[in-house]
Amino acid sequence: MCGIVGILGRGPVVDKLVASLRRLEYRGYDSAGLATLEGVRIERRRAEGKLRNLEEQLRYCPPSGHAGIGHTRWATHGKPTESNAHPHATENVAVVHNGIIENFRELRAELERNGAGFNSETDTEVVAHLVDSYLKNGYSPQDAVQASLPRLRGAFALAFLFKANDDLLIGACKGSPLAIGHGRGEVYLGSDAIALAPLTDTVTYLEDGDWAVLTRATCVIYGADGSIVQRETSKSGVSALLVDKANYRHFMAKEIHEQPTVAGKTLAHYLDVAAKRVALPLALPFDFNCIQRISITACGTASYAGHIAKYWFERLARLPCDVDVASEFRYREAPLRRGDLAIVISQSGETADTLAALRYAKGKGLHTISVVNVPTSTIARESESVLPTLAGPEIGVASTKAFICQLMVLGVLAVRAAKERGKLSEIDESQLVRELIEVPRLIAAALLVEPQIEKLARYIAGARTVLYLGRGTSAPLALEGALKLKEISYIHSEGYAAGELKHGPIALIDEAVPVVVIAPYDEVFEKTVSNMQEVAARGGKIILITDAKGASEAMVDTLLTIVLPAMVASFTPLVYAIPVQLLAYHTAVARGADVDQPRNLAKSVTVE
């Protein structure tokens, strides 16, 4: 969601602040701002809309302070206006914030009774006035923050800049990530290592409840109880080159085309390629023979990866599997058996609802595995076992390469579970591993259909509604295709299991409705053809994604048939996801949409 950066520099920090905010744009935002210390005075610059609007403000009279904080805001409390943009400040302190202060109304009422004047609709401004109230009573900045933090309910990451203190930043986090970067004579705060990538690769991640007092020479971290704690400092592994578009127009295009490479890299991490067997890089603390049920929780695209994995765990390992949207998991009061397995999936490893689901599952005594793209994330740190995807930083808000790598990891884990439970022979395991090893090559081949899809996208761009249909493992992929299209092109789209067509969605079909059918030639292909015939009979325009056998057997008029390489049916979603992603991307481009930063969306959703 919101992005935070703070810098104590050796020279003017404004350019570094703006550059770091630029790297945080991928998180999603609708306003931006920064504050620097100019002599003893805090100076703020804020702007509604894109970062370029803030840069325009800074162009003619840039601040020269050597200490500052910056922020990209994704509106939660109050409209996306300049007055609601961060930093929020009093005369004595400025603050930037990611998260939600749940008790801000009662705190605001108390502060207003004591004479505080508010200029915004936000929950964050309460934090500035609360800290300021302690400063006015003679507290030091450190003591004022320490006194304020226990009074805040909710999830937050905070960075504070203080009047007349050009060698002091204070950061705090609870339920939202915050990282400290260490440079030569400089120190940094950031929402993640990507924000700090060109400045430093030496990073310390604060843990839940931590707060830190930073100077250019010292970094003291306190736990929630106020005692000094030690946190591990490590190399971030995030290169500035990895957050560059290279020669691509958009990050999403770059990330789609990186998928053969990152899929191969992820597979190499989890397979013994020479022996054609699964070789996890860690020992799982349980035996799959003792697991009676798997619970998978995730949000958005990651949840569709979970739905596809459900087919694999149940078919291959004969292991019952539930899939829940993370925001609902805690509330449906499902009977969970101690000793069973919960798998949580999150690209960022910071998704608030998924983190809450993880904690709920742990509280019920389940073993926990996280599938995350950031192995230093909160979800990773709190999981019993971590299976990282090796997708590299994903900047585009619409997930592509992380989704494919999530499927890779889950597919490998399903094979491991099946083998451990005696449902696969060594020959069976070897065959499935061979199929997985082929996937990067098949993804590369699938990318060759891009010119066809680019032409098709110009037609889809004029549609008001698009339907996606699929059966088996293609049904969740239909849901993912619809999500991709709607989130970046803003065209209304829905995905359905093809068998559900006649139970409602068929009412939408007419000559103006494109219907994307994902149908590899498999055991349910003939049934999917029947659904296509129902669409054709009502004038719907069919776009069929299949293989050569499917194309020859369909015998249905289509607007376009996209032919993918033939492959064994087990892992088709890993390849059939490619044209689905490309169609969403090129349709969004054709409509002139902001592909990498679609409106109202955030890459890392760190509030519930």
Swiss-Prot record:
Residues 284-423, 456-598 form the SIS domain. It is found in: Cytoplasm. The active site is at C2 (nucleophile), K603 (for fru-6p isomerization activity). It catalyses: D-fructose 6-phosphate + L-glutamine = D-glucosamine 6-phosphate + L-glutamate. Its main location: cytoplasm. Keywords: Aminotransferase, Cytoplasm, Glutamine amidotransferase, Nodulation, Repeat, Transferase. It is an enzyme of class 2 (transferase). CDD domains: GFAT, SIS_GlmS_GlmD_1, SIS_GlmS_GlmD_2. GO terms for biological process: carbohydrate metabolic process; fructose 6-phosphate metabolic process; protein N-linked glycosylation; UDP-N-acetylglucosamine metabolic process. Its EC number is 2.6.1.16. The keyword Cytoplasm applies. GO terms for cellular component: cytosol. GO terms for molecular function: carbohydrate derivative binding; glutamine-fructose-6-phosphate transaminase (isomerizing) activity. Gene3D superfamilies: Glucose-6-phosphate isomerase like protein, domain 1, Glutamine Phosphoribosylpyrophosphate, subunit 1, domain 1. Residues 2-217 form the Glutamine amidotransferase type-2 domain. Involved in the production of the root hair deformation (HAD) factor specifically on soybean. HAMAP family: GlmS. This is Glutamine--fructose-6-phosphate aminotransferase [isomerizing]. The lineage of its organism: Bacteria, Pseudomonadati, Pseudomonadota, Alphaproteobacteria, Hyphomicrobiales.
